[in-house]
Amino acid sequence: MIDKLSWIAVYPELVLLVMACLIALVDLGVKSPRRTLTYALTLLTLGAVAVMEASYALGGQTFYGFGNMVVVDPMGSWLKCFSSIALMITVVYGRPYAADRDMLRGGEFFTLSLFALLGMFVMISGHNFLVLYMGLELMTLCSYALVALRRDDAQATEAAMKYFVLGALASGFLLYGLSMLYGATGSLNINEVFNAIASRQVKHQVLVFGLVFIVAGLAFKLGAVPFHMWLPDVYQGAPTAVTLIIGGAPQLAAFAMTIRLLVEGLLPLAIDWQQMLALMAIGSLVIGNLAAVAQTNLKRMLAFSTISQMGFLLLGLLAGVVNGNQLHTESAYGAAMFYALTYVLTTLAAFGIILLLARAGHESEEITDLSGLNQRSPLYAGVMAMSMFSLAGLPPLVGFYAKLGVLQALISSGQTSYLVLAVFAVFMSLIGAFYYLRVIKVMYFDAPHSHNAQPISAPADAQIVLAINGALLLVLGIAPSSLMTLCAQSINSIVNSLGV
């Protein structure tokens, strides 16, 4: 018999599931091409689950359900809350774009987005290999369908096919690695796997063999080198509203899954996976920044930017354990979580501008499409400038403190190799600043092209959300301590559960 606590653990997921099905049914009777009722119900659902998750997080308790297959803890609850808010913002930005391209027909855009979020929730709360994998597959299958939503668009169809083939390969890697760990430890439960490895009664070679495949699968979901090949093509080929769905909230779910597997499950193997993360971080910083410099397509540039940002995120993850010492675990993983949250917030603002500048029959995807944006809309230009400055890591924007937190975690480790990595990361950030500042130069100093001279029109709700989104980049940069503390305390709950 399933106890009451188990049902409490999955209340938000049940609400999300029921509402996604209900919205699909309601949409059958909606005739409006802009799907106003479906849109309102989607926002209501996302707001409700965000409030539920925030209440769980503020409770500060950690408890398990369904035979330890699901965990509710502050880290997971906050990440699910922020994922819901991120998707809510995405839906607000994406609705005008999707309506102009007949993507709201049938209501699949909203329904698939909610089911993708359900998969993210399962990824974040899963404490069992099979549960994590099921959540991952639910999210990715919905993502494949969303990328291919414009069936008459050859570029989107090509992107969906690439995403599907490479995604299936990465899922196979991850599943094979998990099966190796199951064979070695005899358990699918993350806590039991941790205890089995810590007991040193399992062959190290078998564990490392499985670990390689797991890290490969996780790197694909994060978009880290050398498993980044899908990212630029999918970002560029997918409809921009879908690009933001893929590049926003799923990054938080991928971060949570990485913490669940590598920290909660495989922390005794830290010295092994840290070496892999270090190589991937270096590759991501180099390839991401150098490739972004050569791009003229804004979405493709932001895709390579994402790869470089994931390099910074990986640096935070590898700084948590130093020679088996977990003294800096909380600060390092807290800095990584803070980095993930601020990256998603900044990405939402940047892609929000691209979405709101697009109009029927025209995609504002080229950097030159932003020419003279300040003359047409100082608000849009200001938000985009803050996004670029934040991604570049310049004060007083929140991206500066995100990068600073990761660098402090590396330096405080006291390891020469980590200090070298910190210096290298700063150097690559200087290269990255070039292509971010190029966007600002185009907006403020170039004359608008003739096809960009039309006045910008966007729904009031989207403009309000955009203004708040941009303001948060500045406010959290001026006063980042509250969010930093929240991240550190969330990670502390994970560390305490491990007894390290």
Curated annotation (Swiss-Prot):
One of its GO terms (molecular function) is NADH dehydrogenase (ubiquinone) activity. It comes from the Bacteria. It catalyses: a quinone + NADH + 5 H(+)(in) = a quinol + NAD(+) + 4 H(+)(out). GO terms for cellular component: plasma membrane. Signal peptide: none annotated. It is an enzyme of class 7 (translocase). It is a multi-pass membrane protein. NCBIfam families: NDH_I_N, PRK05777.1-5. NDH-1 is composed of 14 different subunits. Subunits NuoA, H, J, K, L, M, N constitute the membrane sector of the complex. This is NADH-quinone oxidoreductase subunit N.
